[in-house]
């Protein structure tokens, strides 16, 4: 009976965090709108080999992540939950692997369940795991690779070792097909310190070739298919998306070496108090507990690798938090039995975070001291939603202090208010600039009959395309991340330079309504834009709709 209650509580936990709130949050540009539209076009065209966005070739990532996202939209239709269904599934399956691996290592059901709960409630895991990007998929394949390598090295027969390495190759191959060759670098770097410490070179060299073979066999069918269809894909994907993005001086998203330190700290909420002890236990047990050191290697080595790369994004280190959750669960149980100082420290951190959020909400509210508040006066209810988010965080932090020895796991409920209310608390000024669905909802009657729609933002273009279910949105003035796709001669008409817009407008105006959607500064005078006089203008915050009727 008690176990049934725990199962029901866990199901409710997943439903409240990962299912119920998804349709209350609009899609973000550029990431969510991009992946939503690529997968929608894949379903609409039936082309499961070459990814396209806005009808243009899109070679920034391989295909597997789009497959899973497309299946989500195929199953659940045209909804925000459908767009996020793939990453939610990947996150939940990763949590299942976390629990299974913890059980395999320590044979402790409580530790296994707590590992999964901690993983799912980590703020960085929850944030990325409900956000339609490809990183939750690669995190799953890396976790599966972590499990596969361990199984292979612990197997006592040649059949078991062979199966483990073949499975490792499969996970690496799917990782490559999801996000690229980083899915090969991260596992190799992660296992090397453990192999050296355990002196397991013999097994690695004897069976490692099987992983290479299975990895190649997984990649080969699609790799050959896209090479036949688009011969320059692999050159662009390897050179631009890997070498330039991560290593060269002009890498995208350049950041200093220490960039990930604050992300690790904030991402560990609401379990930050367990972080130092969890890492320390993994290091202290390296000599007599191979599993703890193995987990530590899968945290530290990817973190060092991504820290040394010139290009950095917070999503890159998502895979580090799966092994960290297991170490945190083990350290939490140990602390409850021996010394609850770390558990109480964790409770106070959550109280402090909640109180800080409450104060910060007031400061940026319409009643606060700043001149440009985040929320306008008519958005007062959103301020109260924000206060509720941080009040719940502080409340559950306090609740864990009332009996830290038994109630410390309730820290998993600290982000509950965030999960349920963040969509309602979002300021209109953010929606107007970062969530194109808000703009489409306000201007749909003008957008739908348009023969041509042009915009100067790729993220907005993808949002318009997905919301309106059309892939013929054109780019105006700026090409952004679609520059490479627009260089193909068969799609030159998809981009209109600002200098050519007047002549293009005169040529196409008789074909139907032409709508221009532009990003502008909040205080910019749209009457001074260097475009022909319009028949209709609708200004929505940072976006302005400019419409030309046939003449």
From Swiss-Prot:
Name the UniProt record assigns to this protein: Undecaprenyl phosphate-alpha-4-amino-4-deoxy-L-arabinose arabinosyl transferase
InterPro entries per the UniProt record, alphabetical: ArnT_tfrase (IPR022839), Glyco_trans_39/83 (IPR003342), LipidA_mod_glycosyltrf_83 (IPR050297)
Entry keyword set: Cell inner membrane, Cell membrane, Glycosyltransferase, Lipid A biosynthesis, Lipid biosynthesis, Lipid metabolism, Lipopolysaccharide biosynthesis, Membrane, Transferase, Transmembrane, Transmembrane helix
Pathway membership, UniProt: Lipopolysaccharide metabolism; 4-amino-4-deoxy-beta-L-arabinose-lipid A biosynthesis
Family: Belongs to the glycosyltransferase 83 family.
Transmembrane parts of this sequence: 7-27, 81-101, 111-133, 137-154, 176-196, 208-228, 255-275, 289-309, 313-333, 347-367, 383-403, 408-428
Lineage of the organism: Bacteria, Pseudomonadati, Pseudomonadota, Gammaproteobacteria, Enterobacterales
The organism's place on the tree of life at top rank: Bacteria
Cell compartments where the protein resides: Cell inner membrane
An MF annotation (GO) of this entry: 4-amino-4-deoxy-L-arabinose transferase activity
EC number of the protein: 2.4.2.43
Species per Swiss-Prot/TrEMBL record: Escherichia fergusonii (strain ATCC 35469 / DSM 13698 / CCUG 18766 / IAM 14443 / JCM 21226 / LMG 7866 / NBRC 102419 / NCTC 12128 / CDC 0568-73)
Topology of the protein relative to the lipid bilayer: Multi-pass membrane protein
Keyword Glycosyltransferase attributed: yes
GO biological process, one term: protein O-linked glycosylation
Pfam families, A to Z: PMT
Group of enzyme by EC: transferase
PANTHER family: MANNOSYLTRANSFERASE YKCB-RELATED, UNDECAPRENYL PHOSPHATE-ALPHA-4-AMINO-4-DEOXY-L-ARABINOSE ARABINOSYL TRANSFERASE
Function: Catalyzes the transfer of the L-Ara4N moiety of the glycolipid undecaprenyl phosphate-alpha-L-Ara4N to lipid A. The modified arabinose is attached to lipid A and is required for resistance to polymyxin and cationic antimicrobial peptides.
Catalytic activity, as annotated: 4-amino-4-deoxy-alpha-L-arabinopyranosyl di-trans,octa-cis-undecaprenyl phosphate + lipid IVA = lipid IIA + di-trans,octa-cis-undecaprenyl phosphate
GO cellular component: plasma membrane
């Amino acid at each position: 009976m008690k176990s049934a209650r725990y199962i029901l509580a866990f199901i409710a936990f997943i439903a409240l965090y990962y299912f119920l709130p998804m349709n209350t949050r609009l899609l973000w540009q550029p990431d969510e709108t991009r992946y939503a539209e690529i997968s929608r076009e894949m379903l609409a065209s039936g082309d499961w080999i070459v990814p396209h966005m806005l009808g243009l070739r899109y070679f920034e990532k391989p295909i597997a992540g789009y497959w899973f996202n497309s299946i989500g939209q195929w199953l659940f239709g045209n909804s925000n939950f459908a767009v996020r269904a793939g990453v939610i599934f990947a996150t939940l399956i990763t949590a299942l692997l976390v629990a299974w691996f913890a059980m395999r290592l320590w044979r402790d059901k409580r530790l296994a369940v707590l590992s999964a709960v901690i993983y799912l409630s980590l703020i960085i895991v929850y944030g990325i795991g409900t956000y339609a990007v490809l990183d939750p998929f690669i995190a799953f394949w890396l976790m599966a690779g972590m499990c596969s390598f361990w199984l292979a090295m612990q197997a006592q027969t040649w059949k078991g070792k062979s199966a483990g390495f073949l499975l490792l190759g499969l996970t690496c191959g799917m990782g490559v097909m999801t996000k690229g060759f980083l899915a090969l670098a991260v596992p190799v770097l992660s296992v090397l310190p453990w192999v050296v410490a355990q002196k397991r070179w013999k097994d690695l060299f004897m069976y490692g070739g099987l992983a290479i073979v299975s990895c190649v066999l997984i990649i080969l069918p699609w790799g050959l298919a896209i090479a036949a269809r688009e011969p320059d894909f692999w050159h662009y994907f390897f050179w631009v998306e890997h070498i330039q993005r991560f290593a060269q001086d002009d890498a995208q998203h350049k950041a200093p070496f220490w960039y990930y330190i604050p992300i690790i700290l904030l991402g560990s909420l609401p379990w930050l108090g367990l972080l130092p002890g969890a890492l320390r236990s993994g290091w202290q047990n390296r000599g007599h507990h191979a599993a703890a050191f193995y987990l530590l290697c899968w945290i530290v080595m990817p973190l060092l690798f991504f820290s040394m790369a010139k290009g950095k994004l917070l999503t890159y280190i998502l895979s580090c938090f799966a092994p960290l959750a297991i170490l945190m669960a083990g350290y939490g149980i140990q602390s409850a039995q021996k010394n609850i100082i770390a558990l109480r420290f964790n409770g106070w951190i959550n109280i402090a975070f909640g109180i800080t959020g409450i104060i910060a909400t007031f400061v940026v509210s319409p009643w606060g001291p700043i001149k440009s508040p985040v929320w306008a006066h008519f958005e007062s209810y959103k301020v109260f939603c924000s206060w509720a988010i941080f009040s719940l965080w502080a409340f559950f932090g306090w609740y864990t202090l009332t009996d830290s020895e038994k109630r410390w796991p309730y820290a998993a409920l600290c982000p509950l208010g965030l999960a349920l209310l963040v969509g309602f608390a979002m300021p209109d000024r953010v929606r107007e600039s970062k969530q194109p669905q808000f703009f489409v909802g306000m201007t749909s009657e003008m957008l739908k009959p348009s023969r041509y729609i042009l915009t100067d933002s790729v993220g907005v273009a993808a949002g318009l395309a997905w919301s309106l279910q059309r892939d013929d949105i054109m780019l105006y003035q700026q090409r952004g991340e679609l520059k490479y796709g627009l260089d193909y001669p068969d799609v030159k008409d998809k981009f209109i330079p600002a200098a050519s817009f007047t002549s293009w407008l005169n040529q196409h105006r008789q074909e139907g309504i032409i709508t221009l959607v532009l990003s502008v500064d909040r205080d910019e005078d749209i009457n001074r834009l260097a475009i022909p006089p319009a028949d209709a203008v609708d200004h929505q915050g940072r976006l302005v709709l400019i419409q030309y009727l046939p003449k």
